Amino acid sequence: VACSSDKPSGDAPATEGAAETVTLRVWGAQDDQEMLQGMIDAFIAANPDTEWDITLGVVSEADAKTKYLEDPAAAADVFAFANDQIIDLVNAGALYKVTRNADDIKARNSEGSIEGSSVDGQLYGYPLTADNGYFLYYDSSVFTKEDVDSLDTMLAKANEAGKKVFMDVSNGWYIASFFLGNGGTFAIDADGNQVVDFNNENGLAAAEAIKAFTADPAFLTGDDSILVAGMGDTIAAGVSGTWNATAMEEALGENYAAAKLPKYTTAAGEVQMGSFVGYKVLGVNSQTKFPEQAMDLADFLSNEENQKLRFETRQLLPSNTVAAAEPAVAENIAIAALQEQNPYGTSQKEVLGTYWAPAEAFGATLEAKDYSIDLQTLLDDMVEQIQTPAGN
């Protein structure tokens, strides 16, 4: 009698009485190893009808694409990656399309995370987190919640208090917030080259705001070490992400606070600063010998329960909408600020490698208060360089 089964067909014994062992390798970040091992053990326990051999290796989300491309056949069957790598991974034929349980995966995760895990409308990954973004940390003994809604107000109050407002403007990741807030866009043309519109009228207005900010006596730039060392002392507010939450809380104590990025002022009015929003995603290697089981494992590792566990263990913002709505998430000051900023965010998926160096150079010029070249020319030069294909 024929009967249906939810079990993957690959679970069927290869020969009568001798089930095939399903061998899978998983890559994850160093800090996730213990947590991932627990999740893998739970997956094996939940699927006792299969003989499993699942091993775990250390490759961070940031390094996943590079490591995969070194030797695709030797890469893990299931691996975590930052979603700004997804176009390159898909173009390299690295990822299996998500063909099992896709509708459920789309329904349970935020729209942004699904878009960030898809290419040309096709889902290629399993969203894990929505935590790769930035927002504003501030000292509540210097600023009120209302103050930090306006960059102008913040700078005025910081100057009164003899304090600094920190932002790494010579970093392309952060400087984009001004352009994105005022309608700037990233796109990829038919030839696979970067297209940006940061030198139009809105881009010039954003650049004027960057110039005014970097010229203000209260402005301070630098890397994370400058922010961490100065917060609560010389620095009263700074733009950063969740990775610095512990250091910020330790520095500020009872004055620890965070919010979305502020608005800046243009001739046309106030503009809410944008940001980049990135997602951590699980992918299944297109060369895996066990695609169905690899998909089931990726599905399990990224489900609601395990996203809650990720938050509890690592304070990583879930992409799962139910997990993200947990009271503990809203009570986490840094995570709540990130959630407040994320609606103004733009996926990094459309950002190519040609963007970063020209944007950094533009920011560095304004940080140095070098006004020898007018802003429009600086913008035109930056955009031309960004849109020049790599290797040209």
Annotate each language-model stretch with its function:
Residues 42, 46-109, 146, 236-237:
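Extracytoplasmic "Venus flytrap"/periplasmic binding protein-like
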Residues 83-134, 257-261:
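Hinge/lid segment of periplasmic solute-binding proteins
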Residues 316, 333-388:
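C-terminal capping/gating helix-and-loop segments adjacent to ligand/active sites or protein-protein/ligand interfaces
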Residues 193-222:
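Glycine-centered hinge/linker elements that transmit conformational signals in sensory
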Residues 17-31, 50-57, 77-78, 124, ...:
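Short, well-ordered beta-strand elements
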Residues 29, 214-290:
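Extracytoplasmic/periplasmic substrate-binding proteins
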Residues 124-128, 134, 152-196, 202, ...:
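Extracytoplasmic/periplasmic solute-binding protein
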Residues 246, 280-354:
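Mature extracytoplasmic/periplasmic domains
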